[in-house]
Amino acid sequence: MDIKRTILIAALAVVSYVMVLKWNDDYGQAALPTQNTAASTVAPGLPDGVPAGNNGASADVPSANAESSPAELAPVALSKDLIRVKTDVLELAIDPVGGDIVQLNLPKYPRRQDHPDIPFQLFDNGGERVYLAQSGLTGANGPDARASGRPLYAAEQKSYQLADGQEQLVVDLKFSDNGVNYIKRFSFKRGEYDLNVSYLIDNQSGQAWSGNMFAQLKRDASGDPSSSTATGTATYLGAALWTASEPYKKVSMKDIDKGGLKENVSGGWVAWLQHYFVTAWIPAKSDNNVVQTRKDSQGNYIIGYTGPVISVPAGGKVETSAMLYAGPKIQSKLKELSPGLELTVDYGFLWFIAQPIFWLLQHIHSLLGNWGWSIIVLTMLIKGLFFPLSAASYRSMARMRAVAPKLAALKERFGDDRQKMSQAMMELYKKEKINPLGGCLPILVQMPVFLALYWVLLESVEMRQAPWMLWITDLSIKDPFFILPIIMGATMFIQQRLNPTPPDPMQAKVMKMMPIIFTFFFLWFPAGLVLYWVVNNCLSISQQWYITRRIEAATKKAAA
């Protein structure tokens, strides 16, 4: 029966690793994006003179009619002067042609740990990469649906900055056409990654005005610049949406390649997800919108929505708005903004285990202030929770070690007659009250916790560039010197020495290979995950040594 234990452990190891690889196949990107050399060396902030994005491409502006094709628009001259806005957490550039956000930096999140002055760039439309947030007014009289192209807005300043002591910053872009005055207003708040984008329509044309507000995210097919170099760290890169009838629906690039999505929904949100960061358009909850995904003529992927018809009588004024979130996947903040938006922190199919783990880990961190020590304390708590199961397992192993001479005698007696050997072993186990599979139970129970913690460490932006101590400066990437994986392999070897030797030579060889196999797998795993496994193994060794010695002492005492 001991062969079952060996096979089970080996199968769990293989299945766990295959699941990680499968996760990458399903949600990861095969190649990382080609980085713009100039962008990698620029100083922090948004550079001057970056060309504005394409304003007149037909695929940029959706049709207000859910049954029709995207509107065909003629291009107009591109804007050369971007409007720059800076708050304490955002640095962005707005193209006056259409009022799209074509660049966006996150100064609180450095692109690389060794260059803290260079912020991570979420949006970019000036080089080899395309990722931007677009919005406008389409429909019967919408200025973004004109044959001459999208509107050219004017701003009072070329740059805006949230001053010290200022809690809110408002940036107004103005445009007039045929007696209708438009103000596209961007409202920013201190310390917040969400902003309000509103349209104030003043109809002085003498005729009724009607149109629709649209908002969308456009991205090319390049890889995820926020993913790390550790094995198994490529998370989902693609679109997602939420509706009351279908909460949290992923729409991958492959899905968009197969055909666009078009649905009538109420409220909800549309988003683009990547490792650690998310961008989402959130319309008014009461609006009935047409959500659409499609691919434009340049091969860019688009997810967005078109709102209901807006009617403005002659001489009347109307305001319509939407919220844009562009920043880190901070669960507490996302949950406040819109129902289901926190699900963009994708913990996989074990989310119901991962979410409580993160909640507990976050509370531990609030006391300790270090994510590495928080992982260690979390491991101790999890180990304490599983102690009754572990103790039963170690008692079973200790009894197995005690009957090892009897098992060897059975092997000598029955030789190659495996059927009689198995029957004799079962009788011996029954007599000695030993469960031969008892040692597997903690592994079975802890494996879902291990995988859930893997996704917590992988998906939680709080782990990004989080140091522990000494050479571990980032728990979300691999150990740069492979010290933790080697320690983990050593602890597995020690733990193996405490276990009874399998009676079959082939089983024994397989078990001896397990520390080497696991060490190889863990060389490229996130350091935080390896830290958890090292601490878990050390605690297991201590528990097993203590229980084994107690049982051996009791056995000797009974024999005396």
Swiss-Prot record:
GO terms for cellular component: plasma membrane. The keyword Cell membrane applies. The chain crosses the membrane at residues 1-21, 341-361, 367-387, 437-457, 468-488, 515-535. Residues 42-66 are annotated as: Disordered. GO terms for molecular function: membrane insertase activity. It is found in: Cell inner membrane. Keywords: Cell inner membrane, Cell membrane, Chaperone, Membrane, Protein transport, Transmembrane, Transmembrane helix, Transport. It comes from the Bacteria. GO terms for biological process: protein insertion into membrane; protein transport. Its main location: membrane. It is a multi-pass membrane protein. PANTHER family: CYTOCHROME C OXIDASE ASSEMBLY PROTEIN COX18, MITOCHONDRIAL (PTHR12428:SF65), OXA1 (PTHR12428). Required for the insertion and/or proper folding and/or complex formation of integral membrane proteins into the membrane. Involved in integration of membrane proteins that insert both dependently and independently of the Sec translocase complex, as well as at least some lipoproteins. Aids folding of multispanning membrane proteins. HAMAP family: YidC_type1. Interacts with the Sec translocase complex via SecD. Specifically interacts with transmembrane segments of nascent integral membrane proteins during membrane integration. Belongs to the OXA1/ALB3/YidC family. Type 1 subfamily. This is Membrane protein insertase YidC. The gene is yidC.
